[in-house]
Amino acid sequence: MKTPENLEEPSATPNPSRTPTERFVYLEALLEGGAPWGFTLKGGLERGEPLIISKIEEGGKADSVSSGLQAGDEVIHINEVALSSPRREAVSLVKGSYKTLRLVVRRDVCAAPGHADPGTSKSLSSELLTCSPQHRKATWSGGVKLRLKQRCSEPATRPHSWHTTKFGETQPDVSMMQISQGTMGPPWHQSYHSSSSTSDLSNYDHAYLRRSPDQCSSQGSMESLEPSGGYPPCHLLSPAKSTSSIDQLGHLHNKRDSAYSSFSTSSSIFEYPPPGGSARERSGSMDVISARGGLLEGMRQADIRYVKTVYDTRRGVSSEYEVNPSALLLQGRDAHASADSQGCAKWHSIPRGKGTPSPSWSQQCSGSLETATDNLPQKAGAPLPPTRSDSYAAFRHRERPSSWSSLDQKRFCRPQTNSSGSQKTPFAEDQLHTVPERSPENSPPVKSKHNYTQKAQPGQPLLPTGIYPVPSPEPHFAQVPQPSVSSNGTVYPALVKESGYTAAQGTCNKMATLDENGNQNEASRPGFAFCQPLEHNSVTPVEKRPEPTAKYIYKVHFSSVPENEDSSLKRHITPPHGHSPYPSERKNIHGGSRACSNHHSLSSPQAQALHVGDDRRPSRLSQPWEGDFQEDHNANLRQKVEREGQGQGLSGNSGRTRSAFSSLQNIPESLRRQSNVELGEAQEVHPGGRSKVEDPGRKAGASDIRGYLDRSVSYPRPEGKMNAVDSVHSADSRYEESPAPALPQTSGASQRRLSSSSSAAPQYRKPHCSVLEKVSRIEEREQGRHRPLSVGSSAYGPGYRPGRTGPTPSTSSSDLDDPKAGSVHFSESTEHLRNGEQNPPNGEAKQEEASRPQCSHLIRRAPADGRGPPARGGEPSRPEARLLRSQSTFQLYSEAEREASWSEDRPGTPESPLLDAPFSRAYRNSIKDAQSRVLGATSFRRRDLEPGTPATSRPWRPRPASAHVGMRSPEAAVPSSSPHTPRERHSVTPAAPQAARRGPRRRLTVEQKKRSYSEPEKMNEVGVSEEAEPTPCGPPRPAQPRFSESTVADRRRIFERDGKACSTLSLSGPELKQFQQSALADYIQRKTGKRPTGAACTPEAGLRERAQSAYLQAGPAAPDGPGLASACSLSSLREPEALPRKEHTHPSAADGPQAPRDRSSSFASGRLVGERRRWDPQVPRQLLSGANCEPRGVQRMDGAPGGPPSWGMVAGKAGKSKSAEDLLERSDTLAVPVHVRSRSSPTSDKKGQDVLLREGSNFGFVKDPCCLAGPGPRSLSCSDKGQNELALPLHHPTPCWNGSGCKATVASSAPPESSGAADHLKQRRAPGPRPLSAGMHGHFPDARAASLSSPLPSPVPSASPVPSSYRSQLAMDQQTGQQPPSSPASAVTQPTSPRSPELSSPAYGLGEGMWKRTSLPQRPPPPWVKWAHAVREDGLAEDTLAPEFANLKHYRNQPSRPSSCSTSDPDTPGRISLRISESALQPSPPPRGDYDDEVFMKDLHPKVTSSPTFEALPPPPPPSPPSEEPLVNGTDDFPPPPPPQALCEVLLDGEASTEAGSGPCRIPRVMVTREGHVPGAAHSEGSQIMTATPPQTSAKGSEAESNTPSSASAQPQLNGSPGKQLCPSQTRNLTYEPVERTQDLGKKTHAEPQKTSEDIRTEALAKEIVHQDKSLADILDPDSRMKTTMDLMEGLFPGDASVLMDSGAKRKALDITARRAGCEAKASDHKEAVSVLVNCPAYYSVSAAKAELLNKIKDMPEELQEEEGQEDVNEKKAELIGSLTHKLESLQEAKGSLLTDIKLNNALGEEVEALISELCKPNEFDKYKMFIGDLDKVVNLLLSLSGRLARVENVLRGLGEDASKEERSSLNEKRKVLAGQHEDARELKENLDRRERVVLDILANYLSAEQLQDYQHFVKMKSTLLIEQRKLDDKIKLGQEQVRCLLESLPSDFRPKAGAISLPPALTGHATPGGTSVFGGVFPTLTSPL
């Protein structure tokens, strides 16, 4: 079909170069039958030429009369995807066409006058209203996505097939792009074979859309994508069922695809922004948008018959609806025109949003993109080179697979210059929306969220009604334009364009152009128009029209995109605005002037460039901003209207817009018809009706900005009617809601429209209102307008995808703070964000910018909160959020909203893909996740996960926007539905797909990996959470503090998002969150006997928050929930608690900091925390600012939920985290969970419940001490790693715990900590006390509130005051579940900068394990472990604690390792590790975690009291008693901890003052716990543990005491020194802690358990003898660190020690007794002396030959200077021989006892075997027998190899300089062989472990619990006893060898004065060298079996 293109609207013309309307005719060609299509494409963006059909093969499909294609035709759209011009893109699209290929080509009428026959032209014209090329372009951009349903000459259905489409002649590529369906090679083959697409687009589209955009490319476009260097035509791809579109998008978007990685993301995102604004974000490159616009335009014309494929995620069905091309085209043209002029601006704004110079990049991108996209002369303008900043952002995004690909961004950048319209067009299109989301700014991503809603529409069948309750969470069609639910974005391009078309039609009638919002729908701003209030648009219809070119385009994009996208657009626009070269623009935006609004869209560099001279530039800025926002909302409304039915009686414009949208998206022909008609008439109507509404709305908004803000708030806001409408149309309502704030009337109209159109709307609105809005209102009220900025950002959150966080944070903070301001401020914030992100329009904008990081977070959270202040009561909180909620759960809503908002914050971030993830969440996401993981792990991880670096560049393009959009949008819910989407995967809740991966795969921290292993199903959460978080971590983090104003849940969500780099990933569906919350609450109740409630019960609060997501905090909780829930799932193990803590802490401080807590669950989160902290300078600023800091925190905590309720919400957040953890409770069992528990929700829970109690408890010492320890130490080790790690734990104390930052934070001097402290603040989220103060009050409304307020100041001022204030903080932390531990631990630990973290870890209660971690500065996670202990203290008896500690020990060990890894990651370690630990701590540890904070603080004090205390702290962990072994085991992965004393000193230094007051109370418990766990650790009675653990100490009390001195000194040496060994009794005492015992036992066996006086004396004697007789040094040297068999066996049987402990307690006791007896006999003053036998593993160090040589040497007469001296030495030798003999006797007794144990165990094994043989099947019994037999063999093999290897290594080590090379090489060879064998044996052991699990699973089906325990005991004891036996044998042999050497060294005539020397039986016959049997016999030759 041919359609003359009207170029009437110059303003709409992106490129002035466009020729007049009459010159070009647009033809749609439908080729059917599949490839080859019979034409060749040439030119393209790569060549700087338009994509031209260079050749049409005769007889080919393209040569058919029906196609009407001619050589020379410029391809504008392929499969309804506007081309961005890269031929590769076109080829990809063509190849992506399966059976049908729809081309819209532009023919130069002048060149081929006869080609466009009037009929065709007319028909097309009817379908695609003739418009200026811009118009057409806008139309295409706006609506091209839709397939033209009825192309005059084409069948209704359009078959999808790949056809070769050479894109312009301008691209005469060497290889004509031959589009092969399956292949797309860089050199495009000319023959176009290969069926276009494997599956029909209708089917493909849905899945494709669902798939992350990147995955789309994998559809087949991936291949196509690769070759093309140009920008992906994703945005061009129509959401319609165009496989090619999808494929193209996919290939374009497949960032994951290595080849398409760069532009694949963008392209895939374009078509359908993933979640929320993700699509936009993903498509996220201006050029992509532009290309999309152009492509869409072309597609639109080509695909005159737009088939819209709607995939109903809920119903799991996809429907194709054809949309009337006329309406689409009209709208599309308008949209396209506006897109052309505005697409650029939009895109520009997006880049600007990124914080890069919007103008240059935008312009460049716009022109470039448009040129590439449309290939129209108008877009001929050379693309401006992308601004470095923008290009960087773009590239960066490219680097991030999940985000819009770099290509996307590139595209974004390039095309922008040529035509803002083009870019805008893409923007105008939903597709385009996706692109903006991708843009670094990610302003559109906010809209994308709304797109979610829209997506939901596509998810629903395209029905005339257009109101489908089914948000179609994730339509699987290319039209993901609306990142919200795919359904919204189903016809992404078309939808956007349709909105655009509506505008386009309106463009024809300028007045009629007014969209639903009364905005003038210009070609330029089709989407915008409906969004814009009449006030601006109507006022200057004509004037606006030019502006709309950019503005409308922008709006069109918004239009297409739901509010979310609108917000995104706003964001994008605003950033351009903010960055806009025109300060007036920003001011306008801020001022709310229409100009600002309009200019906003122009704000994009392109638009600005185009309209720089234009008056309407400012106007446009004002209007486009407003219009953008409105349009997006209007687009939502439109969509809703469309869904409802265009004829439903919505405003004509709204209806028309929706019609266009609908036809493109979900509306069938009727809708399309309406689109055509309504676009004409409804638009006019709207100018009257909707326009009026909007006008008043805008006026009511007081300013365009206000209107924008309102609008923006509208969707964020759940309160207005819009909410109800939103409920009905998740996507649409969202979209519509967006405008609500700005246009109360408009909002009302939209709401009415929506509510009338959708019954779900009220429902949604209710939930939103009730939960989200209520909470937000409450919190905001409480917080008052203290956080107006925050509110803006928060409200912005959902809408403000870009999350430019700069302005957003403050705005968000502000807005969120005020319930009323929530919505309004949100809008303002959004506007500010957009403006401020780039260049704050005013101080507020700048403030927002400063807080930008927070803003992003705030945004993420704010969405859940009332998106805006209640002031905009009429406005829906967050349409998208509401949609999400309506879709799934309130939680889903809030979660999605939060996610979306966060996504919005980071639309350009790698997380941006998260947005589209919900769309393509299915398969595509899976693929993308896999690819991203690889890429992220390799090259993207840093950017995605690293908070600092990525954050630095991402501040303006926080991932939150994209990710949030994705998460928040109804689509987010869909992803949950899509099992394929890994992101979604992590969201348990189907409706909470917000977890969609936004960016490239992020590298998982060890903690994350552990979580993923422990909870494989949450693997994606692991990656996503972190991914999402890292970007936001930067600028978004600062913004987060603003969220503190919002609901606690919201804040927590924000923080989760921050930390989330993990958060999004970890975000799970609201349902999951709720479930987790409930589970967590139950779990807490079970463990602590208290159900977390309100502030007191963080867990419940967390639960409530999660639940709140659904009910209490529907909006805020849910948004937070999603991020948090996911984080909980993903990182709930470690992050959840921290997050709750943080939340609690940070709610007081600023929610911004809290989010990281959850996020910290991910490794990225940890880092994010750090980055956040870095960005936190803004957070600190906000925090410092009274409103943001304490007021916000307090308000938010206290006020939002209503004082304590708010805290409860915070607790809820924590609970949420906890909830996730609760779900992960299973993981809690894991060692890692210990950290989490203590840090995360458990902390919140317990804190909430037991915080008061625990305030007096012992726990919290290490963690808090770290904080208190002082900034210095902490800042060193904790600051970075510890900080990240401990930051969360120390969040409350954050002030203390950042070195300088700590104190700054504590002092609430964010500015000081802006660098470090800010970072820490971010990490702690409530920068220390100040948030603590506020948060504490809120969190600890009971007792804490009061104390907290005062404590807060104290902690803030300094760490030392922490004792009382710290306690409060601890309380707060407990409530928050985060900071107190951080602060105290940090403070105490910090003094010892390196150890500080370690100390805090051990102090945490990790005991030895913690100490080990302590060695690792990253040990902070252990503090959580300690918290776990604390929990135990709280909830359990001392004994219980011991067992738990046993778990803790495991947990510690695991957490330790995670910690180690985490530790490596400053941010991750604490959070991740701790969170994971949290799970391990599952029972009481969670509460303990909170208490741990307090306890830690108090513990610190005792520790401060005595350095042993610190050691005691480490000892508390179960591993501690066996410090050496347990530590080794626990520290297997970690370096040994520094000497406990040093740590103690460090802790003591920090803790002395910190814990002085509060420490004592808690220390006892902690001590008890620790003491029980670590007898050795408890060695220092002064230590808290010892002091606090008298009961447990009773068992090990004496041991602990005796160990205390040696332990303190020995602990450091534990690993290698026998002296470090704890005495068996101690180990036995540890029996209650199996793990610890086991480790202890193993260690003890290896190293003497505890030094008795005899041991000390023996050691002293040995040293003296060695000093005088060097020949005995090797054998007797107590300090000898020779390797032993046990050294090499270490870690292989970590649990054996505990088992052995149980059964071998007797043996150990005997051993110890014998040893002690010997020691007593030989007791001496030499404390250092260690049992020579134990200390000197001469057996291992000396070979038998060498021993003989030594004997010979000793036989030689020793020349002593003095006979007396010689005699004295001989006497000592005799004494030592006697001592060793005693020891050997005791060892023999122990061996006898061990043999008895072995017999008993074997008997037990026989019983078990008999039982199993009777119960199990023969094959199962065989498995059991084989396993048992192999267990014996493998253990013995390992022992043998370990002994031999140790012996060889010792001999090698002992070789002298003179050793021959042969001997050395021989030994080396032996060692190599043995090492290989040992490694093989280890593998066998691993295999055996797997088999053991299999057997256990089998037996679990047959055996009772008791029988199963018997079996497990038997198996464990079997290996443990074997190892113990070998240990004893080695020790006996060593002792015998030592005795023999001593005897040989004695003179033959020597007679001891004491009388005959008693020799061990084996040596009684040994003859002295002289031959006299001095000892009554000749010693048998000792040979070392090893």
Swiss-Prot record:
<protein>
    <recommendedName>
        <fullName>Protein Shroom3</fullName>
    </recommendedName>
</protein>
<feature type="compositionally biased region" description="Polar residues">
    <location>
        <begin position="1366"/>
        <end position="1399"/>
    </location>
</feature>
<feature type="region of interest" description="Disordered">
    <location>
        <begin position="342"/>
        <end position="463"/>
    </location>
</feature>
<feature type="modified residue" description="Phosphoserine">
    <location>
        <position position="912"/>
    </location>
</feature>
<dbReference type="GO" id="GO:0005874">
    <property type="term" value="C:microtubule"/>
</dbReference>
<dbReference type="Pfam" id="PF08687">
    <property type="entry name" value="ASD2"/>
</dbReference>
<feature type="modified residue" description="Phosphoserine">
    <location>
        <position position="439"/>
    </location>
</feature>
<keyword id="KW-0965">Cell junction</keyword>
<keyword id="KW-0963">Cytoplasm</keyword>
<feature type="compositionally biased region" description="Low complexity">
    <location>
        <begin position="796"/>
        <end position="814"/>
    </location>
</feature>
<feature type="modified residue" description="Phosphoserine">
    <location>
        <position position="1063"/>
    </location>
</feature>
<feature type="region of interest" description="Disordered">
    <location>
        <begin position="1304"/>
        <end position="1425"/>
    </location>
</feature>
<feature type="compositionally biased region" description="Basic and acidic residues">
    <location>
        <begin position="895"/>
        <end position="908"/>
    </location>
</feature>
<dbReference type="GO" id="GO:0000902">
    <property type="term" value="P:cell morphogenesis"/>
</dbReference>
<keyword id="KW-0206">Cytoskeleton</keyword>
<dbReference type="GO" id="GO:0007389">
    <property type="term" value="P:pattern specification process"/>
</dbReference>
<keyword id="KW-0175">Coiled coil</keyword>
<feature type="region of interest" description="Disordered">
    <location>
        <begin position="564"/>
        <end position="1055"/>
    </location>
</feature>
<dbReference type="GO" id="GO:0043482">
    <property type="term" value="P:cellular pigment accumulation"/>
</dbReference>
<feature type="modified residue" description="Phosphoserine">
    <location>
        <position position="888"/>
    </location>
</feature>
<feature type="compositionally biased region" description="Basic and acidic residues">
    <location>
        <begin position="430"/>
        <end position="440"/>
    </location>
</feature>
<dbReference type="InterPro" id="IPR027685">
    <property type="entry name" value="Shroom_fam"/>
</dbReference>
<feature type="region of interest" description="Disordered">
    <location>
        <begin position="211"/>
        <end position="239"/>
    </location>
</feature>
<feature type="compositionally biased region" description="Low complexity">
    <location>
        <begin position="1114"/>
        <end position="1127"/>
    </location>
</feature>
<dbReference type="GO" id="GO:0005856">
    <property type="term" value="C:cytoskeleton"/>
</dbReference>
<dbReference type="InterPro" id="IPR001478">
    <property type="entry name" value="PDZ"/>
</dbReference>
<feature type="modified residue" description="Phosphothreonine">
    <location>
        <position position="909"/>
    </location>
</feature>
<dbReference type="GO" id="GO:0016324">
    <property type="term" value="C:apical plasma membrane"/>
</dbReference>
<feature type="compositionally biased region" description="Polar residues">
    <location>
        <begin position="357"/>
        <end position="376"/>
    </location>
</feature>
<dbReference type="Pfam" id="PF00595">
    <property type="entry name" value="PDZ"/>
</dbReference>
<dbReference type="GO" id="GO:0030036">
    <property type="term" value="P:actin cytoskeleton organization"/>
</dbReference>
<feature type="modified residue" description="Phosphoserine">
    <location>
        <position position="212"/>
    </location>
</feature>
<feature type="compositionally biased region" description="Polar residues">
    <location>
        <begin position="653"/>
        <end position="677"/>
    </location>
</feature>
<feature type="compositionally biased region" description="Low complexity">
    <location>
        <begin position="865"/>
        <end position="874"/>
    </location>
</feature>
<keyword id="KW-0472">Membrane</keyword>
<feature type="compositionally biased region" description="Basic and acidic residues">
    <location>
        <begin position="630"/>
        <end position="645"/>
    </location>
</feature>
<dbReference type="InterPro" id="IPR014799">
    <property type="entry name" value="ASD2_dom"/>
</dbReference>
<dbReference type="GO" id="GO:0045177">
    <property type="term" value="C:apical part of cell"/>
</dbReference>
<feature type="compositionally biased region" description="Basic and acidic residues">
    <location>
        <begin position="774"/>
        <end position="785"/>
    </location>
</feature>
<feature type="region of interest" description="Disordered">
    <location>
        <begin position="265"/>
        <end position="285"/>
    </location>
</feature>
<feature type="compositionally biased region" description="Basic and acidic residues">
    <location>
        <begin position="1634"/>
        <end position="1654"/>
    </location>
</feature>
<feature type="modified residue" description="Phosphoserine">
    <location>
        <position position="1219"/>
    </location>
</feature>
